[in-house]
Amino acid sequence: MSMLETRAERMVINLGPHHPSMHGVLRLIVTLDGENVVDCVPVLGYLHRSMEKIAESRTIIQYLPYVTRWDYLATMFTEAITVNAPEQLAGVQVPRRARYIRVIMLELSRIASHLLWLGPFMADIGATSPFFYIFREREMIYDLFEAATGMRMMHNYFRVGGVAVDLPYGWVDKARDFCNYLPPKIDEYERLITNNPIFRGRVEGLGYIGREDAINWGLSGPMLRASGVNWDLRKVDHYEIYDELDWNVAWDTGGDTLARYVVRIQEMRESVKMIRQALDQLPGGPYENLEAQRLSGGPKSEWNGFDYQFIGKKSSPTFKMPRGEHYVRVEAPKGELGVYLIGDDSTFPWRWKIRPPGFINLAVLPKLVQGTKLADLMAILGSVDIIMGEVDR
């Protein structure tokens, strides 16, 4: 009886760009040896929209609605970096109340982004129940955003020198209620997920990257901190009012998919702590624009003093960026989001270079998945947290 001959050729398959677990229009060309992944090549560009070139023919206020389409699940961060770059280049002072409001919005956006990461990530590995619980809390954050900004996702809220409008009456109390509501729900997620033997069997030891490799690849955010690197730009760069708040950097030494999950869960808890403190310490004063009140009151207006006239003044729509260059970065939910800005005494930037965290984090994917099973590729990709809007720009 003759033995059946098996084919030793490798198989090349396409995943995406419309596969449900691709998190957007990502395409992966995967080389398989049986069920084992031999190679994986990400193919980008399906969502490229010339975001950097568009910036060169727009004022900052005109460009703000565009930037919410980079990482469309954490739009407060793309707005923050867009106004921080010209503010630091031109030395614009931001009132304390506006800085506190910004931090509250940024941390709410971080929680919303991590929640929307956790739901699809669990669905990718076959657990659909947590998805529905997680979206329940995410909707509450979007309700807070809608009350403050008028928009649920694309907020267009940040401005050079502050924010667009002050917080509405009763908003602070609603935000406090949410901060009391969320921690027990995070405990509920952990009871459902963290020690679930099926979950741990799917993610433990999977997609490992060590400390040195994480640094050498230029990883940032939860991808870097899950590999044992205690590095958070909110502590390193001292921007906004993070130094005035008591909080800890969430990090882990596991370096695998489970560690990245643990770091993001810890970050949600720390964000709640920060929001609570910022709400309690929220100062009075201008949020951005006292110019209208000063003009309506005439030359004897109480708003006519030096501080209010200049520090609390709304920037002009034709705000000119001085000649010079500057790199600004913030700690976004997915890592270091940066902008390299070159100004030339014009209302338009001469160069606007975006440093998206997802693009750099995606580069390490072939290394993470090499030698794993095809079914594990989705879990590893989900743990990286890719949003193609910011990858392709």
Swiss-Prot record:
It catalyses: a plastoquinone + NADH + (n+1) H(+)(in) = a plastoquinol + NAD(+) + n H(+)(out); a plastoquinone + NADPH + (n+1) H(+)(in) = a plastoquinol + NADP(+) + n H(+)(out). GO terms for molecular function: NAD binding; oxidoreductase activity, acting on NAD(P)H, quinone or similar compound as acceptor; quinone binding. The keyword Transport applies. It is a peripheral membrane protein. One of its GO terms (cellular component) is plasma membrane. NDH-1 shuttles electrons from an unknown electron donor, via FMN and iron-sulfur (Fe-S) centers, to quinones in the respiratory and/or the photosynthetic chain. The immediate electron acceptor for the enzyme in this species is believed to be plastoquinone. Couples the redox reaction to proton translocation, and thus conserves the redox energy in a proton gradient. Cyanobacterial NDH-1 also plays a role in inorganic carbon-concentration. Belongs to the complex I 49 kDa subunit family. This is NAD(P)H-quinone oxidoreductase subunit H 1. The gene is ndhH1.
